[in-house]
UniProtKB/Swiss-Prot annotation:
Coiled coil: none annotated. This is Epsin-2. Signal peptide: none annotated. One of its GO terms (molecular function) is lipid binding. Plays a role in the formation of clathrin-coated invaginations and endocytosis.
Amino acid sequence: MTTSSIRRQMKNIVNNYSEAEIKVREATSNDPWGPSSSLMTEIADLTYNVVAFSEIMSMVWKRLNDHGKNWRHVYKALTLLDYLIKTGSERVAQQCRENIFAIQTLKDFQYIDRDGKDQGINVREKSKQLVALLKDEERLKVERVQALKTKERMAQVATGVGSNQITFGRGSSQPNLSTSYSEQEYGKAGGSPASYHGSTSPRVSSELEQARPQTSGEEELQLQLALAMSREVAEQSSESVQTARGSKEERLRRGDDLRLQMALEESRRDTVKVPKKKEAKACCKPGSHSQQTTLLDLMDALPSSGPVTQKTEPWSAGASANQTNPWGGTVAPSNITDPWPSFGTKPAASVDPWGVPTTASTQSVPKNSDPWAASQQPASNAGKTTDAWGAAKPSSASGSFELFSNFNGTVKDDFSEFDNLRTSKKPAESGASVPPQDSRTTSPDLFESQSLTSASSKPSSARKTPESFLGPNAALVNLDSLVTKPAPPAQSLNPFLAPGAAAPAPVNPFQVNQPQPLTLNQLRGSPVLGSSASFGSGPGVETVAPMTSVAPHSSVGASGSSLTPLGPTAMNMVGSVGIPPSAAQSTGTTNPFLL
């Protein structure tokens, strides 16, 4: 510690200077080096405090008023004031403008040392620069912004240097001081250039100066800390690299395992599919005896279930062995009635009632397999066909099958459940409710119920008829007229009809307004149409009263005709007038209510 610094500290204690004043006195001391940047930064930060600002400015103005041998006080005060204007509070520049005359007077500062050197030139030049800056507001703003940015940047650098504990060389008891004074200036002032190290960036130099260790022990400590920190950083980086590499290798290994597993699964599926395709191709060859469909191939892949029991479902496709196909074709009996066979079984024979049997059968197929024709009784039982909708015929053999018969209760009727739902009456009662008619006559009305076979005449043929199956709706459909061939017309006993003409059907008295169309035989057998025309236009012809009367309640004759023959008087009138037989027939069936 020099003598000047000891004397300065003694004055600070005696005069009871504040902290801000002590710092200003330290920055503007008479020592042969310039103020440090860190000290000027602390003073600039104190300018934002009102109390410290007044103390700082009072001490600065006091230092500017020195003269003579204390020219360093003046020069350092101008340097500190320039720094405070650029980085301190704005009130510093305002107060400097107010007291600008004090700065302008320093342009005439004179001091010549004992060696004859003019030391006042530095003060004069500095005062001129400061006055020019205070007068130019735009320049002051630009300089202030730039200085603030530099201050912030240097503060960040100083923080980084302090945290990293970077050493910049061996320390010594003599601090490396930086100053803004050039060697030429100090040469003129008689200073030793070796004692002053000029620097273009005094702030960086001051930061480095503070970071340098002062003793050898501190230097060793900083070196050990730096080595430990560098080793820790290297280990962390190596661990992070190894961790990243290991995670990457793990991901690659997992991806390879997953792809390998997928490839194995795909190959296993291919090996399962290839034999199936080969079997399907072999089955589809022309010379193959066992042709299977793709659906059966898929069903073969399923595990085998137990033996399939026969179904009693009335609507199932398979039928029992004692049943015959009602549509004419004979089907070979089969134990398997499930349309979806189990695994490992051969496909059953086709039970399609509309197709031709594919399997070879020892039973001969009858030539006449028309399901709508009248049933015939062949010699052999194998070729029997049964008309499901035809008229009932006595069955002498047990091989015939009647769809609606009950077989005296031995076999359960397929439609008995539906018949029980429709009516609670017995089949005999429902059959008795239908009005009986002679089986030889044809029903004139399509909405009349069909005649039923008498139970007394055929006691052994107790069966279900379509009428009993349909119940009360039997009158809506004439099944015999739709399925069986019409019965041949009975011989007409009407003497007025032409030979070979068909017997006219009874006319409904409520439909007399509709003309009766002539048949083809009537058109062929009728005489010239002129007689009928003359009948309508001849003079003196009176309206012929009906010679017959409709008797709806009369018993029907054996011939099936419901018309009463004309008497002799009517025959004479017809002969005298010349009415043709067809006209006489239509006249004889006139409605008596329309006279």
